[in-house]
């Protein structure tokens, strides 16, 4: 996958990877590496082009950006090509959670915000409200249904956004810095919610302790390229890789080595 912004800056330079259904994978890297840009391609917010022919073979229910001899769309998610033909269905299947909840919230009440997705999927107003209340209950915010979203705390707004994504019943969840700017209590609560979701998850983050806690595999993105991937402990514990790409080995891994 390749992508350049209108000013000519090449943000993605031949990114290739695959995530199997049900995996929880971390995307880590320094600021400006292209992490958010990559995430925005997974539900069609940004159009990309293939760096080489690609296929979805063998990854019909996950995320696939893999070389092939046949020319295919650059990104496949949950068995669908991410292109103009499949845009609405891709956006239903792929839930994208932005880093800043204020980029995602726009309605006058929490309930209306969470119900927006189901309404646009064709549900009746009554059914959309039922789904919204159910999802607000899942994130422990049912009592905030009638409140103005922007009057809530940062962590609460983040949970409203998660409820709005879950209301569309995605099979793939893409999260951009889900714990950024959260206090410890809000972070723990949000991580518990993410941990309990049974779907494919790709998490872009600088919170490497969270990666150790939640993820089975890690991808390192730097300067628009995947420069390392593998089991979380192997990747995050590789001092040479981490240092070369502006990252630090998590403290818990360092302490574990010292104690052993």
Whereabouts are the PLM-identified features?
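Conserved ABC ATPase "signature" region
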Residues: 126-144
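Catalytic Walker B motif of ABC-type/P-loop ATPase nucleotide-binding domains
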Residues: 173-176
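A short, surface-exposed alpha-helical micro-motif characterized by mixed small hydrophobic
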Residues: 211-213
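Conserved ABC ATPase signature
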Residues: 148-152, 156
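Helix-to-loop junction immediately C-terminal to a conserved catalytic motif
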Residues: 43
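The feature captures the beta-strand-to-loop junction immediately N-terminal to the Walker
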Residues: 28-30
């Amino acid at each position: 996958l390749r992508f350049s912004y209108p000013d000519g800056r090449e943000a993605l330079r031949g990114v290739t990877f695959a995530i199997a259904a049900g995996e929880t994978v971390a995307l880590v890297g320094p600021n400006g590496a292209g992490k958010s840009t990559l995430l925005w391609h997974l539900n069609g917010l940004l159009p990309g082009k293939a760096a080489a022919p690609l296929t979805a073979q063998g990854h019909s229910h996950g995320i696939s950006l893999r070389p092939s001899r046949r020319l295919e769309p650059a990104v496949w998610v949950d068995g669908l090509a991410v292109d103009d033909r499949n845009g609405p269905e891709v956006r239903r299947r792929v839930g994208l959670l932005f880093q800043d909840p204020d980029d995602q919230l726009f309605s006058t009440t929490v309930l209306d915000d969470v119900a927006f997705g189901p309404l646009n999927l064709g549900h009746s107003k009554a059914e959309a409200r039922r789904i919204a209340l159910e999802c607000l209950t899942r994130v422990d915010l049912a009592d905030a249904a009638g409140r103005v979203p922007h009057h809530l705390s940062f962590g609460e707004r983040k949970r409203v956004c998660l409820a709005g994504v879950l209301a569309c019943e995605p099979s793939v969840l893409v999260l951009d810095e889900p714990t950024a700017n959260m206090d410890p209590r809000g972070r723990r609560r949000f991580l518990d919610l993410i941990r309990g979701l049974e779907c494919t998850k790709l998490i872009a983050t600088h919170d490497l302790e969270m990666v150790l806690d939640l993820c089975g595999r890690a991808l390192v993105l730097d300067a628009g390229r995947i420069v390392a991937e593998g089991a979380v402990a192997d990747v995050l514990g590789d001092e040479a890789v981490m240092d070369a790409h502006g990252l630090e080995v998590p403290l818990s891994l360092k302490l574990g080595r010292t104690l052993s």
